[in-house]
Amino acid sequence: MAFLKDLYKNKVAKDLQKEFAYSSVMQIPKIEKVVINAGIGNAVADKKHLEAAISELTLITGQRPVETKAKKSIATFKLRAGQSIGAKVTLRGDRMWAFIETLFNIALPRVRDFKGISNNSFDDQGNYTLGIKEQIIFPQVVYDDVKSVRGFDVTFVTTAKTAQEAKALLVGLGAPFQKVRGDK
């Protein structure tokens, strides 16, 4: 599963250095980590929803997630401070590259009516956040074992200084962005 890592080292990094005229190899943007976050609203009423989400995220990422807890009590939602309401995983190294490869090449093309990922989800620091609506697009999740369909957020944390650099990095790695009028 090191195909994307090799692609980055051998091709994408060199292309980025030429495109943005970096003077040092250390200036070339790279992906530092991928953070997957799932907020489980049903976990307040029933702990089984949280356990199911954790097991599905474990299957998808190959790493056990950490439970996220509520910071404040909110009476309207019957939520107490410190109560588990979600899960998150931070992927680095080989697991990160394997997840990115699975996401771009297998999972996203399985989305119904998929036209590409949004061009507008970059922040000012060159990070990209993507929302996944259904966990069943991943081949690791068995459709018959899923009790409820839930989504999660995927954040690509990069060393890029601008959104333009981050987009060039992700496009080089094969991210299927939406076509904008005028693009080839």
Swiss-Prot record:
What keywords would UniProt list here? Ribonucleoprotein, Ribosomal protein, RNA-binding, rRNA-binding, tRNA-binding
- Superkingdom of origin: Bacteria
* InterPro entries per record: Ribosomal_uL5, Ribosomal_uL5_bac-type, Ribosomal_uL5_C, Ribosomal_uL5_CS, Ribosomal_uL5_dom_sf, Ribosomal_uL5_N
Per UniProt, what is one Pfam family of this protein?
A: Ribosomal_L5_C
Per UniProt, what is one GO molecular function of this protein?
A: rRNA binding
Cellular-component GO terms for this entry: ribonucleoprotein complex; ribosome
PROSITE patterns recorded: RIBOSOMAL_L5 (PS00358)
Q: Mind listing the GO biological process terms from this record?
A: translation
Query: What PANTHER family does the record tag this protein with?
Result: 60S RIBOSOMAL PROTEIN L11-RELATED
Q: How does it assemble?
A: Part of the 50S ribosomal subunit; part of the 5S rRNA/L5/L18/L25 subcomplex. Contacts the 5S rRNA and the P site tRNA. Forms a bridge to the 30S subunit in the 70S ribosome.
UniProt similarity note: Belongs to the universal ribosomal protein uL5 family.
State the function annotated in the UniProt record.
This is one of the proteins that bind and probably mediate the attachment of the 5S RNA into the large ribosomal subunit, where it forms part of the central protuberance. In the 70S ribosome it contacts protein S13 of the 30S subunit (bridge B1b), connecting the 2 subunits; this bridge is implicated in subunit movement. Contacts the P site tRNA; the 5S rRNA and some of its associated proteins might help stabilize positioning of ribosome-bound tRNAs.
Q: Which NCBIfam families match?
A: PRK00010.1 (NF000585)
> What name does this protein carry?
Large ribosomal subunit protein uL5
The upper taxonomy is: Bacteria, Bacillati, Mycoplasmatota, Mycoplasmoidales, Mycoplasmoidaceae
Gene name per UniProt: rplE
